[in-house]
Design a protein with these regions (language model features):
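Conserved glycine-rich "GG(E/T)P / GGGxP" loop and the immediately following alpha-helix
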Residues: 1-139, 144-147
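Canonical Radical SAM [4Fe-4S] cluster-binding loop centered on the CxxxCxxC motif
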Residues: 1-5, 166-173
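Generic structural signal for small/hydrophobic residues in well-ordered secondary structure
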Residues: 4, 31, 79-81, 162-166, ...
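Secretory pathway export signals and precursors
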Residues: 145, 163, 207-210
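Short, small/polar residue-rich loop motifs at catalytic or cofactor-binding pockets
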Residues: 150-152
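Short, acidic, Ser/Thr-enriched surface-loop or helix-capping motifs
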Residues: 158-159
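Flexible mid-to-C-terminal extensions adjoining Fe-S/redox cofactors in radical SAM and related proteins
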Residues: 169-226
Length: 226
């Protein structure tokens, strides 16, 4: 399922009330380009929050020149394509970017595959410990990391049903801070549960679930790491 237009509008409207100027990323547990209203969502976000950067992370499976143009015409500032299929896929999207005269600022290819001699297919984190039984097995941490994590201090994840998750790596949806359908976003962001989680993680305490089995390096902040 995908987020409703009404819920998306509610978030954008509430962010506008606090003059939000940060980053908005369309990504998540499903491919955002499969949502038929994605262009409408991007356009509303850019109109309502003109000083924000609107980005998307896609696997590229349904992308073509026509859809790329429509995304940028809708207001998308930057597209990141996660490549899992190897160098041929990388070449395909490199040529597409050249054909459309897209700059590195607007169009980024992220190689998620390993070198051919290793040939395991992709590189991943363990997504909050959820990949233990996945095809590309990356086990949960046997001993929790004693390392700071700043992710919940500067980002959050809104699920299609309104749940606000503390972290986008929480694929098991184990740490839900609130629900935007029932509450205002700022109340969720500043709630006691949110503050307690940030205080723990900012002090290298990963005792929270699923942080206690997560292998994500949470002190890497910036475009290369979100």
């Amino acid at each position: 399922e995908f987020i409703s237009y009404e819920l998306h509008k509610k978030l954008c409207d509430e962010l506008s009330e606090v003059n939000y100027k940060g980053l908005i990323i369309y990504s998540g547990f499903v491919e955002p380009m499969l949502d038929k209203k994605i262009y409408k969502l991007v356009n509303y976000a850019k109109i309502k929050l003109p000083n924000s950067r609107v980005e998307m992370i896609s696997n590229g499976d349904v992308l073509n020149e026509k859809r790329l143009k429509k995304l940028y015409d809708s207001g998308l500032d930057r597209l990141q394509i996660s490549l899992y299929d190897g160098v041929d896929q990388h070449y395909k999207f490199t040529e597409l970017g050249k054909k459309m005269n897209l700059t590195n600022e607007k169009y980024v290819l992220r190689a998620r595959y390993l070198p051919e001699e290793q040939n395991f297919g992709i590189t991943l984190s363990n997504r909050g410990g959820m990949l233990e039984n996945a095809e590309y097995k990356i086990s949960p941490m046997k001993k929790k990391l004693e390392k700071k994590c700043f992710y919940p201090s500067y980002k959050f994840f809104l699920d299609y049903n309104g749940d606000v998750l503390m972290c986008s790596h929480d694929w098991g949806k184990k740490n839900i801070l609130g629900n935007l359908k029932k509450e205002k976003f700022l109340d969720i962001w500043l709630c006691q549960k949110s503050e307690e989680a940030r205080n723990k993680l900012n002090n290298s305490d990963r005792s929270l679930n699923p942080c206690n089995v997560c292998d994500v390096t949470g002190d890497l902040i910036g475009r290369k790491h979100h």
